[in-house]
C-alpha cells in the first residue's frame, strides 16, 4: 500500500518540455505553460489576452508543484525571472551620473572655447596690422641721393653742397645769391629770434 502511494506521488515533467513539473489539472503542463496556452487560445479566438503572470504568482505556484529534489532548480529559475523583470537601480544611477558628467564636460568646453576665440581674433587683428604696416613701408621708395649740381648738372659725388632749398650744388653755385635760392632766410631768422627771446610781460599792478 505504501509503495502505491509513493508511486502515485512521483511528479511528472511538463508536457511542453520546459523543464518544470506539470500538473494533471492543467493537462500535464506547468502553470506558466498552461497560462501561455490559454493566452494563445484567447488570441486565436479574438478575445483579449489575460495579463502576463506576475513574479508573485510564479513564486506562489512553483513551491506547490516542485518536490524536495527540484527546489534549487525552481529557485534559480525564479531568481532569473525576477532579475529580468525588476529594473536595476545601479544601471539607472550610472546613466544619471554619466549624463551629469557629460553636461559638465560640455559646459567646461564652452567656457574654454570663449577665451580661445578672443585670443584668435586678437592675433588675427595684430597680424593684419603688421601686414598693412609692412606694405606701406614697401611702397615708400627710398629717395635717391642727388649727386649732380642743380645749375650746371656737374657730377659732384660726395663733395656736393646741399642747400636749404633742397637742391645740391657744386662749389661755384653753392651760394644762395648765385643760384637764386628760394629759401626765405629772413623769415627763418625772425622765427628763431622769436623762439629764443620770448616777450616777458609783467603782471598788472592792482590798485588798492
UniProtKB/Swiss-Prot annotation:
Q: Which gene encodes it?
A: ZFAND6
What does the record give under GO molecular function? DNA binding; polyubiquitin modification-dependent protein binding; zinc ion binding
Where is there biased composition of kind Low complexity? 83-94
Q: Which organism is it from?
A: Bos taurus (Bovine)
GO biological processes = protein targeting to peroxisome
**Residues binding Zn(2+) 1, per UniProt:** 14, 18, 30, 33
**Zinc finger annotations (AN1-type) as residue ranges:** 143-189
**Residues that bind Zn(2+) 3, according to the entry?**
163, 165, 179, 181
Q: Where is the composition biased (Polar residues)?
A: 54-68, 95-110
Annotated zinc fingers (A20-type), start-end: 8-42
Q: Does the keyword Phosphoprotein apply?
A: yes
Q: Which SMART domains does UniProt cross-reference here?
A: ZnF_A20, ZnF_AN1
Keyword match ATP-binding: no
Q: What is this protein called?
A: AN1-type zinc finger protein 6
Amino acid at each position: 500500500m505504501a509503495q502505491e502511494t509513493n508511486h502515485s506521488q512521483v511528479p511528472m515533467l511538463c508536457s511542453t518540455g520546459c523543464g518544470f513539473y506539470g500538473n494533471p489539472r492543467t493537462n500535464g503542463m506547468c502553470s506558466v505553460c498552461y497560462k501561455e496556452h490559454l493566452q494563445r487560445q484567447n488570441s486565436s479566438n479574438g478575445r483579449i489576452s489575460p495579463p502576463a503572470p506576475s513574479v508573485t504568482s510564479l513564486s506562489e505556484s512553483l513551491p506547490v508543484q516542485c518536490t524536495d529534489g527540484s527546489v534549487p532548480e525552481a529557485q534559480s529559475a525564479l531568481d532569473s525571472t525576477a532579475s529580468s523583470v525588476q529594473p536595476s537601480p545601479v544601471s539607472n544611477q550610472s546613466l544619471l551620473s554619466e549624463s551629469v558628467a557629460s553636461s559638465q564636460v560640455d559646459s567646461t568646453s564652452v567656457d574654454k572655447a570663449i577665451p580661445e576665440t578672443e585670443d584668435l581674433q586678437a592675433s588675427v587683428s595684430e597680424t593684419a596690422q603688421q601686414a598693412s604696416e609692412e606694405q606701406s613701408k614697401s611702397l615708400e621708395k627710398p629717395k635717391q641721393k642727388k649727386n649732380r649740381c642743380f645749375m650746371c648738372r656737374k657730377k659732384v659725388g660726395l663733395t656736393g653742397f646741399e642747400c636749404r632749398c633742397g637742391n645740391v650744388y657744386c662749389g661755384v653755385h653753392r651760394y644762395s645769391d648765385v643760384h637764386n635760392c628760394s629759401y626765405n632766410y629772413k623769415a627763418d631768422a625772425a622765427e628763431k629770434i622769436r623762439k629764443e627771446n620770448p616777450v616777458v610781460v609783467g603782471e598788472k599792478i592792482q590798485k588798492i
